[in-house]
Amino acid sequence: MPSIHVEHWGAGPPVLLVHGSVTGGAMTWDAQRPLAQHWHLIVVDRRGYFPNPPAEVEDFEVDAGDVAELLTEPMHLVGHSYGGVVALLAAAQRPGMVRSLTVNEPPAFGLLPDDPIVRDYARGLRELWDQGPADPTAFLHAFIGYVGSAVTPPNPLPPALLQNAQILRHERLTDEARIPLGVLRETPFPKLVVSGGHSPVFDAVCDVLERELEAQRAVVPGAGHSVQRTGAPYNEVLHRFLAAAR
């Protein structure tokens, strides 16, 4: 088992929640706590994210291996943003342990290398990493603005969020991720792709996943990229999907 922090909320069929960039598990999925009335929510903190020890780099392939190891029994897998890419990779590694797969706006930009809007967006993100502020707080604000996140970080950053901002600066960018669409397409478990209806870039990525994986598709507006922060609207979509996938 990977030596990363995991919290357990509620009881019921297991649902493994994988956070994205900036915020760790509990902060990312706080609005999903009501679902613990029906589900055993397994909330992971990826490597380098508080309260785990600091790490030198954030890598979706390493994280996918960690998440795959946590799939010790059949469970539902849910990933947000960077964690959505992680979840896609992990599900392909251990498909027999996945009851269903849900991803929220995964930045799998490599799926659309010839789409000019997606390509320009990914290039701009890489320029932010190459030329953006060295100060973690300033970089965090620039990143949040770029991706359209609903997160508003406090000023000054508390130690936990500062640690997360520091690992963000050393994140392996997801345009390098190679999503195994063929493997995932052949898996029997149902898939759900969720977007926030705020970005043609993320909509395009989600549309490709819907088509290639024969996935269900949902749009939950109101919180930009941070779709799960809408609370009840997102929870209703997720609960209905999970219940049907039992």
Residue ranges of model-derived segments:
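Conserved HGGG/HGGXW glycine-rich cap/lid loop of the alpha/beta-hydrolase fold
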Residues: 1-53
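Conserved hydrolase catalytic core segment
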Residues: 74-112
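Conserved serine/cysteine hydrolase catalytic core
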Residues: 156-222
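Helix-rich cap/lid subdomain of alpha/beta-hydrolase
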Residues: 106-158
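Catalytic active-site module of serine/aspartate enzymes centered on a nucleophile-bearing elbow/loop
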Residues: 213-246
